[in-house]
């Protein structure tokens, strides 16, 4: 029996991080966690990491699609924060972002790691951006690194 699992070191990988500016005080912490993990765990060089900033979470899938279509990257990490408010806007934004990023991955055969927080409060978002619930940006980077190595097994 053959078991394929991806390691975390991917020093030659080209990684794109697409990040929303909306809720930037949280997203910048996610970005710091992702970059730290890519460099320290994945051994990815600065020159192999590209950061693309977009206005909000709704724009993440479109830009991720363009990044994927460029064929220059081995994985994409999407980072953002969507916080529930008093209107149904949260469901629309979170749902379309999730669906769109998943579609990019399937359409372009590239790992798209979902590091978009969807929380009920600012406090929950802060907890997931490097305080008591860990850093979801770092976790998204770990997923991207592992998937780069898994996908390489099928080339």
UniProtKB/Swiss-Prot annotation:
Q: Which Gene3D superfamilies match?
A: Lumazine/riboflavin synthase (3.40.50.960)
Q: Name one GO molecular function term.
A: 6,7-dimethyl-8-ribityllumazine synthase activity
Task: Summarize where (2S)-2-hydroxy-3-oxobutyl phosphate binds, as residue positions.
Answer: 86-87, 128
User: Which Pfam families does the record associate with it?
Assistant: DMRL_synthase (PF00885)
GO annotation, cellular component aspect? cytosol; riboflavin synthase complex
Which keywords describe this protein according to UniProt? Riboflavin biosynthesis, Transferase
Catalyzed reactions: (2S)-2-hydroxy-3-oxobutyl phosphate + 5-amino-6-(D-ribitylamino)uracil = 6,7-dimethyl-8-(1-D-ribityl)lumazine + phosphate + 2 H2O + H(+)
Q: Please list the residues that bind 5-amino-6-(D-ribitylamino)uracil.
A: 22, 57-59, 81-83, 114
Record text on subunit structure and interactions: Forms an icosahedral capsid composed of 60 subunits, arranged as a dodecamer of pentamers.
Q: What does this protein do?
A: Catalyzes the formation of 6,7-dimethyl-8-ribityllumazine by condensation of 5-amino-6-(D-ribitylamino)uracil with 3,4-dihydroxy-2-butanone 4-phosphate. This is the penultimate step in the biosynthesis of riboflavin.
What name has this protein been given in UniProt?
6,7-dimethyl-8-ribityllumazine synthase
């Amino acid at each position: 029996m053959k078991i394929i699992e991806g390691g975390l070191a991917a020093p030659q990988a080209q990684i794109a991080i697409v990040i929303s500016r909306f809720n930037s005080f949280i997203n910048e912490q996610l970005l710091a966690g992702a970059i730290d993990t890519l460099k320290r765990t994945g051994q990815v060089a600065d020159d192999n990491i590209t950061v693309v900033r977009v206005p909000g979470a709704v724009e993440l899938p479109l830009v991720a699609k363009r990044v994927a279509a460029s064929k220059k990257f081995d994985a994409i990490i999407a980072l953002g924060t969507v916080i529930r408010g008093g209107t149904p806007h949260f469901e629309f934004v979170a749902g379309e972002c999730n669906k769109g990023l998943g579609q990019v991955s399937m359409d372009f055969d590239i790992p798209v790691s979902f590091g978009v927080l969807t929380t009920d409060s600012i406090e929950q978002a802060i907890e997931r951006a490097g305080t008591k619930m860990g850093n979801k940006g770092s976790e998204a980077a770990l997923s991207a690194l592992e998937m780069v190595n898994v996908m390489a097994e099928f080339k």
